[in-house]
Amino acid sequence: MPTDLIRYGSISPEMLAYLWLLIEYKNSIMVAGEVATGKTTLLNAFSLFIPPQMKIVSIEDTPEIRLYHENWIAGTTRSGFGGEEYEITMMDLLKAALRQRPDYLIVGEVRGEEAKILFQAITTGHLALSTIHAKSPEAVIRRLNAEPMNIPKIMLEQLNAICMQVRLIYKGRFVRRTKSITEIVEYDPKIDDIILHDVFRWNPEDDTFEFSGESYLLRRIAEFIGISEKEIINELHSRAEFLRNLCKTKPNFEEFVKKICEYKEYHKGD
């Protein structure tokens, strides 16, 4: 649950409010990190911001994603015990998923040639949420651009944001933190590289999360819905305060989704 992550100190209400806005306005997000850093946990948590009526297709090797949406279709790979013709790969599932025309596509982990199909889907307007094994946002770009994925850098700018997960010892105990949320701004042909911008960063000195105050994606959302940058930042803080207060009630899934829907209904037309 998103509220659990806030209570554990893994992420701030502002960061989750930011991800809520990104998901609501169809931005693709990748969660990166090493083993046991909480990548799937965060992916699962912010997937709960997907409106309940939307069609979701998830694809995984091992079933870890847990959603409660009525229109959720879960796909899992299968080894070909009776030969290769009986094998179901990530590529097979991804191709089948796109034929179902989902509103949201969730891929448990991207690591092979299926990334090409995923980015083709993003380029044609599908929203994708996924995880990847990498140590930094820059490493995400390098891995996606290299074998066996081979995603052209100019296509990588279709991905909107990268959440960086870490597991470390802080004040004598193991903790998980969302170390940063980084926006993919654009591909710069002059340097043949992707321009990145950190919107949020974890400060290990006092275990707080810092907002840079500037977001290209929030600016784009503001332009899309016809409001000012100041208004979209105010909306970010409004949603953060809502999530902060929601933590106090320790809601279950049904209560959480109901409150999210009530918030959106109450603020409709603001």
Curated annotation (Swiss-Prot):
A Pfam family matched in the record: T2SSE
InterPro entries per record: P-loop_NTPase, T2SS/T4SS_dom, T4SS_GSP_E_ATPase
PANTHER family assigned: TWITCHING MOTILITY PROTEIN PILT, TYPE IV PILUS RETRACTATION ATPASE PILT
Family: Belongs to the GSP E family.
Protein name: Uncharacterized protein MJ1287
Organism: Methanocaldococcus jannaschii (strain ATCC 43067 / DSM 2661 / JAL-1 / JCM 10045 / NBRC 100440) (Methanococcus jannaschii)
Molecular function (Gene Ontology), one example: ATP hydrolysis activity
